[in-house]
Design a protein with these regions (language model features):
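Conserved catalytic loop of SAM-dependent methyltransferase domains
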Residues: 50-86
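ATP-binding glycine-rich loop module of kinase domains
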Residues: 125-174, 200
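Conserved kinase catalytic-core helix
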Residues: 171-184, 207-208
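Short hydrophobic/aromatic beta-strand or adjacent loop that forms the aromatic wall/cage
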Residues: 109-115, 136-141, 194-196
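Conserved structural core of kinase catalytic domains
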Residues: 185-208
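Conserved class I S-adenosyl-L-methionine
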Residues: 1-22
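Conserved Class I S-adenosyl-L-methionine
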Residues: 81-116
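Short alpha-helix
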Residues: 27-53
Length: 208
């Protein structure tokens, strides 16, 4: 569902249902805010639900966040992937997102929502990252699973060509483990299961 208070509509994107600027902000469209969607769910008798936050939008999300895994400062930097036609750029959305994240208000201004209603499912990821801007043989989806005490990483091929790439991750774990053993380093443990590669979840500093 589109969020009528999504940040891109403040920043100059057109309302997708009317094709006009600021319609959702002025109450002239059929989209809803997070609070309005929560009211619709509870009024329908659905008291168990989860919100997810596709980014940057719902058509071709690059990431999907959740209340258990919200974005960090500097992550929301792909804000001009607009599919509703022409738009204006009234301010730097990345900087505003960083301020919203710091203030704990990102969920209110997410451009769109994905809702799952019903008893909480333990198999749902808390975070999803799509790597589709690669050659097809390397296109994968990375999921972070589990609660804060039992995190796990799952890598899934999103194209037929990428199946072999995911299978090779186990091979390279073994190769690297041997190569760096004398240096006291070990590769992140990998397990192949149901067509996916599962890894330990490790905290560290990225060198990207």
């Amino acid at each position: 569902a589109d969020n009528r208070f999504g940040l891109k509509y403040w920043a100059g994107a057109k309302e997708p249902h009317t094709g006009q600027y600021f319609d959702s902000l002025e109450g002239k469209a059929t989209s809803f805010s997070k609070r309005e969607l929560e009211t619709i769910l509870t009024d329908s008798g659905l008291t168990d639900y989860q919100f997810y936050y596709p980014y940057p939008e719902r058509w071709f999300p690059m990431s999907i966040y959740s209340d258990q895994w919200l974005p960090k400062k500097g992550e929301l930097n792909q804000n001009l992937r607009n599919f509703e036609g022409e738009r204006m750029v009234l301010f730097d959305e990345e900087q505003v997102y960083d301020e919203l994240i710091k203030d704990g208000r990102f969920p209110e201004f997410s451009n769109t929502y994905l809702m799952i209603a019903g008893p909480e499912r333990k198999d749902c990821p808390v975070y999803v990252k799509y790597s589709n801007d690669r050659a097809e043989r390397f296109m994968i989806r990375t999921d972070i699973l589990g609660d804060a005490a039992h995190r796990q990483v799952r890598k899934v091929p999103v194209s037929a060509e990428a199946v072999s790439h995911v299978k090779e991750l186990k091979h390279w774990e073994e190769v690297l483990d041997v190569q760096y053993r004398e240096a006291g380093l070990r590769a992140n443990r990998c397990e192949l299961k149901d067509g996916a590669a599962y890894f330990e979840f490790l905290h560290g500093r990225t060198f990207e």
